[in-house]
Amino acid sequence: MCEYTVGYVDDDITSYNDYAKRLKRRGIELIFPDDRETKEQIFEWVQEKNIKCFIIDYKLNKVFDFSGTELALYLNSRIPDLPCLILTNYPKDAIDGNLVIQNMIENRDIMATSDPEKFEEFLSKVKQSVKVFEKRIENHKQEYKQLLDKKSGNTLSSSEEERFLDLYKLLRAYGEVDDLPAQLLESETSLKMDKLLQSVNNLIEKVEER
């Protein structure tokens, strides 16, 4: 069984099986989001498959309506810590675009390179990216537990409330926390507003009864 599960998306999948076999021998399961056409669908797939690192082709324009960098930016807007490695035949173009940091851009040939040293460096980067993501998830779990305690005691601020819900959605998607009762997922502001509206309704009913 592979220790690492890594996503892979490209608009040319002719070499995917070869890449997958090669990486599997090194403990990395490379999986492709079949039949996912939009950024939202790929985001949902990332969560379903518990992806902790994503290798993305730079252009993608033969099949998708967006580029690899646009997909990476979208995924990082939803999962800020998800490492996305960009593969391209033109690393300088990707670097000059200033949308992805340089150390997350790889020459496309790296997946098929016959240079063992370069391939080992690439594998190390992928595996280390996964470990960094897992460590950050652990840190998020600790923060989530602290906020959950405050939530249970009704002492969350509005900004903490928003952070709590964001962490819950992320950690739940990765199977790191259990489902919470619906009432715990309601914001304190909403609950207070509901109580206020109920009080107003009760007051109106009393006035109308007179």
Language-model-derived ranges and their functions:
Residues C2-T14, Y19-L23:
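Conserved acidic segment of CheY-like receiver
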Residues D12-S15, E37, K59-F64, P91-D93, ...:
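Short acidic, S/G/P-rich loop/turn micro-motifs used as interaction or catalytic elements
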Residues R26-P33:
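A generic structural motif
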Residues P33-C53:
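Acidic, metal-coordinating helix/loop segments flanking the phosphotransfer/catalytic sites
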Residues K52-N76:
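Conserved phosphotransfer microenvironments
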Residues A72-D96, I105-E106:
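A short, hydrophobic beta-strand element within the central beta-sheet of small alpha/beta folds
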Residues D93-S159:
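Charged, amphipathic alpha-helical linkers/stalks
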Residues K131-R210:
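C-terminal output/effector regions of signal-responsive regulators
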